[in-house]
Amino acid sequence: MEISGLVYLIIIVTIIDLPYGKANNYCKIKCLKGGVHTACKYGSLKPNCGNKVVVSYGLTKQEKQDILKEHNDFRQKIARGLETRGNPGPQPPAKNMKNLVWNDELAYVAQVWANQCQYGHDTCRDVAKYQVGQNVALTGSTAAKYDDPVKLVKMWEDEVKDYNPKKKFSGNDFLKTGHYTQMVWANTKEVGCGSIKYIQEKWHKHYLVCNYGPSGNFMNEELYQTK
């Protein structure tokens, strides 16, 4: 669907401006990868999308619950040895896979990054208590509709089809399976996500960012302990 002429939009905000940006001095955080912290560089939840037309940003309470449930359902599927996909499959069961809990600070930093409408990983997103990992997903349609955030999470899960469980995590895993491995990294305890929907030319896009703490995807380490 082409967009022409004047467009009048009411931007729907579904996230409360959390106090973390004011309570924490992110400019003092030194990330292991270097760079200026995302919450320091951009400083607020105000979208900064250039000529893209922002439709809405943030996640509802229900969407947060759905995202968390999808993560934990998938982690428990792996833990029970019920995932048959892989290269080769199946994935072995895990004995140290715990459920994730939602973390509002991780969600705040993820939302700040999502609101830049820049697809890809930011450089510095760590918080005071740990290093932070990240998954990103972007979908688009020429129809005026936006994918449910759980559908974007499932895109990360689907990377399991390319994962070889017989070896430890390596740099070769990042491109094809890095989102999957972060989702099921056993030592990761918390997750928080941000979302923005916008129009770019004829495309209606939904961008989801999830931050994870402590971070996963460490070289030559196992995703989890097998039974």
Swiss-Prot record:
Primary location recorded for the protein, binned into one broad class: secreted
Membrane-traversing stretches: none
A Pfam family per the record: CAP
Gene3D superfamilies xrefs: CAP
UniProt cross-references to PROSITE patterns, sorted A to Z: CRISP_1 (PS01009), CRISP_2 (PS01010)
Domain SCP: 68-212
Secretion signal, residue range per the UniProt entry: 1-23
Family: Belongs to the CRISP family. Venom allergen 5-like subfamily.
The name this protein goes by in its record: Venom allergen 5
Organism: Vespula vulgaris (Yellow jacket)
